[in-house]
């Protein structure tokens, strides 16, 4: 018998992730603050729950994919939240990019209630979510990770166990740090190509397969050139992630000048009204 999965948060990525689980035959209970966002998956057979509490009482596995650490805190620790209402033995998987310290707090609270918690942030954007090819980095108890592997495999391809609670979130910070300065490089390269009189699309054919090649160059540079700034990943969420990484680095006594520069440029972009655009909209700082 298939486990009942509860999915909280049906944004740009969450909706696709939940759909893969539903398509595998699992009963899927859903909750999101704006019910309209759930309409398409409800039409496919997902079951709407009016509150986090109602969902938590019925699900064997509860997956959260919300916006900010404050949202995670509310969903897990509110009086009508997951920790207070999940049934004994349930698996709690937070796939939001959030604070490692919060992941540890959730794991400790879950253990006291005979629940199993994993922090499992993802990378791959809307494309990875739609195709079920996300990279999933997981922290928590190894046995819980292994028990949830069949669920993870419905949403992603590169699924790696990283260590105890908080390790998934720390790994995601490494991911975001690597992307941050890289996105600036991609935008500058495309702006340079255009300014020099080259055909940027043709330039991409040469440089995507060489040493400069990256996911961002292959997937987001074409969107820049097309003027497609729809969010596969929101600017505002990327700024949040970079802020968490800088906070964690400071706690470890580590300086991150490249990350600091990238965040300052994205802050400038957001101040121009682009916080709800995709991260590729950084290109607008160079090309109007």
Curated annotation (Swiss-Prot):
Keywords: Cell membrane, Membrane, NAD, Oxidoreductase
Chain sites annotated for binding NAD(+): 6-20, 97, 240
SUPFAM superfamilies (UniProt xref): 6-phosphogluconate dehydrogenase C-terminal domain-like, NAD(P)-binding Rossmann-fold domains
Gene3D superfamilies: N-(1-d-carboxylethyl)-l-norvaline Dehydrogenase, domain 2 (1.10.1040.10), NAD(P)-binding Rossmann-like Domain (3.40.50.720)
Protein name as catalogued: Uncharacterized oxidoreductase YkwC
EC number(s) stated in the UniProt entry for this protein: 1.1.-.-
Gene Ontology terms describing biological process: organic acid catabolic process
Family: Belongs to the HIBADH-related family.
Active site per database record: 172
Example GO molecular function: oxidoreductase activity
Database matches in InterPro entries: 3-OH-isobutyrate_DH-rel_CS, 6-PGluconate_DH-like_C_sf, 6PGD_dom2, 6PGDH_NADP-bd, HIBADH-like_NADP-bd, HIBADH-related, NAD(P)-bd_dom_sf
Any one Pfam family match given in the protein's UniProt record, by short name: NAD_binding_11
One Gene Ontology CC term in the entry: membrane raft
Locations listed in the record: Cell membrane; Membrane raft
Source species, domain of life: Bacteria
């Amino acid at each position: 018998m298939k486990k009942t999965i509860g999915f909280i948060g049906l944004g740009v990525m969450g909706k696709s992730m939940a759909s893969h689980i539903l398509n595998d035959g699992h009963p899927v209970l859903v909750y999101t603050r704006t019910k309209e966002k759930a309409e398409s998956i409800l039409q496919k057979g997902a079951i709407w729950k009016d509150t986090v509490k109602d969902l938590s009482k019925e699900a064997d596995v509860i997956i959260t994919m919300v916006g900010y650490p404050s949202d995670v805190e509310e969903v897990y620790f509110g009086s009508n939240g997951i920790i207070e209402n999940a049934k004994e033995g349930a698996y709690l998987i937070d796939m939001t990019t959030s604070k490692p310290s919060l992941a540890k707090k959730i794991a400790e609270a879950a253990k006291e209630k005979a629940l199993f918690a994993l922090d499992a942030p993802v990378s791959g954007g809307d494309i990875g979510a739609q195709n079920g090819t996300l990279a999933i980095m997981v922290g928590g108890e190894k046995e819980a990770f292994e028990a949830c592997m069949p669920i993870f495999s419905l949403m992603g391809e590169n699924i790696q166990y990283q260590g105890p609670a908080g390790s998934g979130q720390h790994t995601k910070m490494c991911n975001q740090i690597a992307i941050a300065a890289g996105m600036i490089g991609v935008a500058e390269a495309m702006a340079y190509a255009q300014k020099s009189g080259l055909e940027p699309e043709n330039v991409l054919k040469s440089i995507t397969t060489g040493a400069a090649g990256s996911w961002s160059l292959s997937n987001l540079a074409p969107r820049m050139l097309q003027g497609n700034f729809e969010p596969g990943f929101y600017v505002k969420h990327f700024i949040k992630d970079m802020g968490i990484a800088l906070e964690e680095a400071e706690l470890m006594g580590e300086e991150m000048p490249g990350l600091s520069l990238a965040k300052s440029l994205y802050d400038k972009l957001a101040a121009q009204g682009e916080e709800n655009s995709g991260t590729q909209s950084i290109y607008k700082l160079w090309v109007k």
